[in-house]
């Protein structure tokens, strides 16, 4: 336990303490001077306001898309309802920075839609200009977090409450506002909070759209331009962490004021079946809400197969050379991604299993600290972790290699492991929580040690949950850019996300960059499908059979 806590502190807390120390210490004493200097700079104040605005707008726009879709898929039955649920999750399988490239090609100043508008009506719309473009991409990428959590909350409500409200004359929007929304608020708040944190953490989308008046890009610019001695970069990192933790606190405080419990689900009724007109209206609503969110998948696919696509609504020449470039001439980006993400996933599965067991079955002190530290990376932006590692470990040489940790590819594996650890821990915790301890107690009564019981009994029963958590960790690592872009030692050691960033910096590289984006989508989609399938097969019924 002590060794594990020490390891987690070195990997998670120590880099964060280093960032905090530079931001609030001067000459060995605490000082507020760097923070005051931050708020005195107009550029930094604008970046802070833009970051808050982007987070709030992304949540608001995402809610306008997600909440109606959640109500539609949970409360009503119509042909193709399952397909709507699958389509609604598709934005999550495309990395946001890849979506930014695709949106720029479809909705940009010289994109497909604006060229058609210019040709037929003589006007263009600045969809992708400045902060507008960033918010548009982030809203249409992260809204499934709100959708999935809201749908889960609505699906768990007692329908008798709704029927009672209808019998008392409450219907339509009033029913939603007075009954459904308050009861589903915890689920909605979880999705909105996750969306807000992901938006302020997102570094790739603003960089792809060449917009730096946000906190995460400003931290990146300060570190890459002025180096690790620049105090402003660390102050920006502290502000980013404060925003994430502040959002968590506000959500918790807001939910603590209300009562959201329901007494069972005895009054549950099946979803309302829609007639022909209702079905047509439902699909029109789906097309209106989901259509824009699915544009990046089409755009990135066309761009990956285009040789010439400039100032025309569609590519004029198609080619397979872009895939030849990334698979034959520059295969290192994909190979590095598979190696780094696989190693990080294996490490996360091992750590997740041990941490979950200690939290649920352990009898040692400090378990609450173990839980807190292993969850912290969810609230820490990737650029902050990257800056912390550069500050904390750039002078430590890897035994046997002789090179500083931050000059090797190992730093990427470690940071990926840290960032994805909460997924593995939560996955292992959930499946272990479903396992009755009777089998473990029986094994110990027969003379097996706790360690042997864990390896021979507990671990096999946790396999599917661990694999699901490992797959989620693999996906998160494979498409990470926020921390990767600062930590890649050399181009030849760069993973897929870094390769995309390099390629799209030039017009001639957009095709290969899009081809790498398609590979990223395939990896994320395959991993998501496999994780979902494993999670469904590792439910309570399966556990009871094993017990």
Model-inferred region functions:
Residues 250-285, 542-547:
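Alpha-helical transmembrane segments of integral membrane proteins
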Residues 157-160, 435-439:
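Short glycine/proline-centered loop/turn elements that form peptide/ligand docking sites
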Residues 163, 171, 259-273, 309-322, ...:
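Juxtamembrane inter-helical linkers in multi-pass membrane proteins
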Residues 22-34, 108-120, 209-217, 258-266, ...:
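Peri-membrane helix termini and adjoining interfacial loops of integral membrane proteins
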Residues 105, 203-227, 312-316, 481-510, ...:
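Glycine-rich helix-loop "coupling/hinge" segments at transmembrane-helix boundaries
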Residues 165-166, 443:
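The alpha-helix within a helix-turn-helix
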Residues 62, 168-170, 446-448:
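A short glycine-centered flexible hinge/capping loop motif at secondary-structure junctions
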Residues 1-28, 40-155, 181-203, 208, ...:
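Membrane-water interface segments at the C-terminal ends of transmembrane alpha-helices
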